[in-house]
Each structure stands twice: as structure tokens, then as C-alpha cells.
């Protein structure tokens, strides 16, 4: 499939536990084969020749029984009603197709010509193939998808450990004012890789339907706070700390290929940094967010006032107290929070 993201809504409609999936599985088990169009646009209806109009409520049993006839079945786009059965579809024969069987060739041409979802169930190969526009996708067995989802979760867990270690190292370097562009690029790159693995698992969850709840819970736990922290790191080091600019950089990186993402120098350039060994200073958004009960508005005021995390670390109680939204109690809490973090990372480094 060229673009899986375009199939998300389709996969939700066909997920295990849905009425449409139940009907498709029944046809597959019976080995009758079928051609089903999920869409009643004028473009689809113009291709219908013969058959008979039903316009009845959809049920898995009705779909299964109607599939015993040779012709195509036409459903409404929401798959709530069966419009036609035993129909012949006559798409433009000049539309190119890579398929060999008559049913699959017709399905691909109808999908390309109308842009609607067309489902072809093979009589011999036990396969359900989806076509939508130029895209093709073979619907996988539940057990296969679940196995792949669990494997991806294991990969995600291992990669998160590596990424968390890089983040901890960056935190220690920020407090000691020893950060290089390489340190930042490595964390930004690993965060993006982690989010990409998460996107892949989300696709599996969609395919699993109601059976994917456990996988979804594990994914949510593993990725909790990762995306938000990643944006804060970008705001800490990008040429400008505007949140929209950080989001735009994240989106730009999301469009890179895997090979492009491996180039740490390119990641550093995206952030506006120079050579990988060039020193950088954090603005402090991420580290200040770790201080308990410190509102986001106060963090914005701190960065606007001091500009760099090191200046916040060096600030006196009086200087902190002068910042809008910070009184003496909060100023002490900021100093104490930063002191504890410095001790924590120093201890972790010794271990």
C-alpha cells in the first residue's frame, strides 16, 4: 500500500468485531469469493450493469448469502445498507492494473476510476484484498496482526530505554553547561524514531479493532509525555523558541525518510545549529517543566527574562522573585528543584 495513513478509516470500518468484517470472514470461510463496493457515488452507479436492486439493511448474514451469486455487491459508503446484488461492473478497460484474476482486475479498475473502497475476496487463495483509489492492501489475519503489534511493542520498549538514557545524559550536560549540537541532535532523532514506531503500532491497533485495547494501553504508557518533551527540546535549542516553529520543525522531520533521519548533521542544521561539536545552551523549557507545580506561564516568563537555563541556575532569590508570577516561596521552590535535579543526575552519573 502506498500510503497506509489513507487506509486508517477503512481499516476501522473493517476491524475485527465489526459487522462488515464478520460478513467478509464468513465469505472467506465458505470459499465463495466476492466483489464488494463500499460506496454509492454516481461514479460507482454508472459502472453497474444488470443485477437487482435491494436497498435493504446490511447484516453479515445477508452479505454472506448474496455473495453466493457471481455478481458484485454494492453497499452504501457507511456499509449500513445493501443497494445492489449480483451486479456486473464495467470499469474503463484502459485503466492499468497489475492484477491477473478477473475479479481482482475489475476491483482495482473500479477503485482507480471511482476512488471508492472495493473489496475483492479470493475464492482460492483465502485472501481479502482492499482497493481504494491507487492503493492496495491485503487484510491480514487477526493473529498475524497481533503478533506484529507485540513485536513492535517490544522494539518500542527497547528503543525508549535507549532514548531515555540519551535524554538523561542531555539533562546532566545542560546543568553543567556542556551541551554540544551532537547531544541535542541525537535526542531529537531518537525521539522522532520512537514516535514513528508508535505510529506503526497505532495502525496495528486500528486493524485489531476492539481486540487492540491492551496494545493501545501499553502504547499509551510507553509514549506518555514523549511527544510533548520532544517539542520542549526543540524549543530549547531551535533558532527561535516559538511553539509553532517547533511544531513546524517536528512536522518537517516527520516527512523525512529513514535514511535522512540518520544524518545527525542534518538534524542539527534543522534546529539552526552549526557543526556537531559546536556548543549549545538550553533555554530551559524542558528542565523547568520538571519542577513540580510550576505553571507553564511562569516558565515562559522565566525564559523571557533570563534567556538561558544557566542564567536561571545562577539567579538569586531576589532576581527570581522579580519575575512576574514568582513570589519568594516559588523562587525558593525553583532553586530547590534545580538543586535536586543537579544532585540526582550527578548521582546517576556515578552509578
Swiss-Prot record:
Residues 4-142 form the DAC domain. InterPro entries: DisA, DisA_sf, DNA_integrity_DisA_N_sf, DNA_integrity_scan_DisA_link, DNA_integrity_scan_DisA_N, DNA_integrity_scanning_protein, HhH_motif, RuvA_2-like. PROSITE patterns: DAC. The keyword Transmembrane does not apply. It catalyses: 2 ATP = 3',3'-c-di-AMP + 2 diphosphate. Participates in a DNA-damage check-point that is active prior to asymmetric division when DNA is damaged. DisA forms globular foci that rapidly scan along the chromosomes during sporulation, searching for lesions. When a lesion is present, DisA pauses at the lesion site. This triggers a cellular response that culminates in a temporary block in sporulation initiation. Also has diadenylate cyclase activity, catalyzing the condensation of 2 ATP molecules into cyclic di-AMP (c-di-AMP). c-di-AMP acts as a signaling molecule that couples DNA integrity with progression of sporulation. The rise in c-di-AMP level generated by DisA while scanning the chromosome, operates as a positive signal that advances sporulation; upon encountering a lesion, the DisA focus arrests at the damaged site and halts c-di-AMP synthesis. Homooctamer. This is DNA integrity scanning protein DisA. The gene is disA.
Amino acid at each position: 500500500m502506498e500510503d497506509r495513513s489513507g487506509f486508517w478509516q477503512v481499516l476501522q470500518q473493517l476491524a475485527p468485531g465489526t459487522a462488515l468484517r464478520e460478513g467478509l470472514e464468513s465469505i472467506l470461510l465458505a470459499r465463495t469469493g466476492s466483489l464488494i463496493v463500499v460506496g454509492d457515488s454516481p461514479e460507482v452507479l454508472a459502472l453497474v450493469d444488470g443485477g437487482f436492486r435491494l436497498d435493504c439493511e446490511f447484516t453479515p448474514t445477508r452479505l454472506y448469502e448474496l455473495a453466493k451469486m457471481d455478481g458484485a455487491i454494492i453497499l452504501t459508503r457507511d456499509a449500513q445498507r445493501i443497494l445492489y446484488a449480483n451486479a456486473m461492473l464495467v470499469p474503463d478497460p484502459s485503466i492499468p492494473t497489475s492484477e491477473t484474476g478477473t475479479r481482482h482486475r475489475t476491483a482495482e479498475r473500479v477503485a482507480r476510476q471511482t476512488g471508492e473502497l472495493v473489496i475483492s475476496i479470493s475464492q482460492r487463495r483465502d485472501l481479502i484484498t482492499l482497493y481504494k483509489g491507487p492503493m492496495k492492501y491485503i487484510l491480514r489475519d487477526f493473529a498475524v496482526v497481533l503478533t506484529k503489534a507485540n513485536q513492535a511493542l517490544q522494539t518500542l520498549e527497547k528503543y525508549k530505554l535507549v532514548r531515555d538514557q540519551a535524554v538523561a545524559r542531555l539533562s546532566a550536560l545542560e546543568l553543567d553547561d556542556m551541551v554540544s549540537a551532537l547531544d541535542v541532535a541525537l535526542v531529537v532523532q531518537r525521539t522522532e524514531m520512537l514516535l514513528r514506531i508508535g505510529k506503526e503500532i497505532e495502525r496495528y491497533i486500528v486493524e485489531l479493532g476492539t481486540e487492540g485495547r491492551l496494545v493501545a494501553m501499553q502504547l499509551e504508557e510507553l509514549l506518555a509525555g514523549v511527544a510533548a518533551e520532544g517539542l520542549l527540546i526543540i524549543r530549547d535549542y531551535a533558532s527561535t523558541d516559538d511553539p509553532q516553529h517547533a511544531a513546524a520543525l517536528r512536522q518537517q522531520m516527520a516527512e523525512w525518510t529513514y535514511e535522512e533521519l540518520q544524518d545527525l548533521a542534518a538534524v542539527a542544521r534543522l534546529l539552526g545549529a552549526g557543526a556537531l561539536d559546536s556548543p549549545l545552551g538550553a533555554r530551559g523549557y524542558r528542565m523547568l517543566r520538571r519542577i513540580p507545580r510550576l505553571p507553564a506561564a511562569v516558565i515562559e516568563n522565566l525564559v523571557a527574562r533570563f534567556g538561558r537555563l544557566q542564567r536561571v541556575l545562577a539567579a538569586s532569590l531576589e532576581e527570581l522573585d522579580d519575575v512576574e508570577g514568582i513570589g519568594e516561596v516559588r523562587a525558593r521552590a525553583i532553586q530547590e528543584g534545580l538543586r535536586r535535579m543537579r544532585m540526582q543526575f550527578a548521582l546517576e552519573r556515578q552509578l
